[in-house]
UniProtKB/Swiss-Prot annotation:
Component of the small ribosomal subunit. The ribosome is a large ribonucleoprotein complex responsible for the synthesis of proteins in the cell. GO terms for biological process: positive regulation of signal transduction by p53 class mediator; ribosomal small subunit assembly; ribosomal small subunit export from nucleus; rRNA processing; translation. It is found in: Cytoplasm. It comes from Oryctolagus cuniculus (Rabbit). Its main location: cytoplasm. Keywords: Acetylation, Cytoplasm, Isopeptide bond, Ribonucleoprotein, Ribosomal protein, Ubl conjugation. This is Small ribosomal subunit protein uS19. There is a cross-link at residue 108 (Glycyl lysine isopeptide (Lys-Gly) (interchain with G-Cter in SUMO2)). Component of the small ribosomal subunit. Belongs to the universal ribosomal protein uS19 family.
Length: 145
C-alpha cells in the first residue's frame, strides 16, 4: 500500500549533442566544439566569427548576468539570422528579425548547431480559401455570391 501511494519520480532524458552532454559542451573550446558540428557549421566557425556575432554573444552574456536568479534573461534583439547557435547561448532569449518584426526565441539545448533564422519564419504560410474567378476552367460554374 505504501509503495502505491509513493509517486513514481519522473525521470527526464538528459540532453546530449552527438553523445556529449551540455555541461561538457559548455567547457569545450571552439576547436573541440567544431569537431562535433556538421561540415557547414565547421566551415563557418573555422572562418571565424565576425564583429557583429561577437557583439551579439557579448550582449547575451550581459543579459544573462543581469537577470535575477531563476528568471529568464531580457530579450536581445538581432538581425543576425545566420548566427549559429552555440552552447553558451542556451537559456537566452533572442528577438530574431524576420524582415518585419522581431520573433522571440528561447534558446534550448536541442537548437545547438542550427541557425537563428530557422526559428523565425520570414513568410506567412498560405491559408487556401475558395478559388476565385479564372482559377480553373471548372471554377466558371461556381456561382458568385
Amino acid at each position: 500500500m505504501a509503495e502505491v501511494e509513493q509517486k513514481k519520480k519522473r525521470t527526464f532524458r538528459k540532453f546530449t549533442y552527438r553523445g556529449v552532454d551540455l555541461d561538457q559542451l559548455l567547457d569545450m573550446s571552439y576547436e573541440q566544439l567544431m569537431q562535433l558540428y556538421s561540415a557547414r557549421q565547421r566551415r563557418r566557425l573555422s572562418r571565424g566569427l565576425r564583429r557583429k556575432q561577437h557583439s551579439l554573444l557579448k550582449r547575451l552574456r550581459k543579459a544573462k548576468k543581469e537577470a535575477p536568479p531563476m528568471e529568464k534573461p531580457e530579450v536581445v534583439k538581432t538581425h543576425l539570422r545566420d548566427m549559429i547557435i552555440l552552447p553558451e547561448m542556451v537559456g537566452s532569449m533572442v528577438g530574431v528579425y524576420n524582415g518585419k518584426t522581431f520573433n522571440q526565441v528561447e534558446i534550448k539545448p536541442e537548437m545547438i548547431g542550427h541557425y537563428l533564422g530557422e526559428f523565425s519564419i520570414t513568410y506567412k504560410p498560405v491559408k487556401h480559401g475558395r478559388p476565385g474567378i479564372g482559377a480553373t476552367h471548372s471554377s466558371r460554374f461556381i456561382p458568385l455570391k
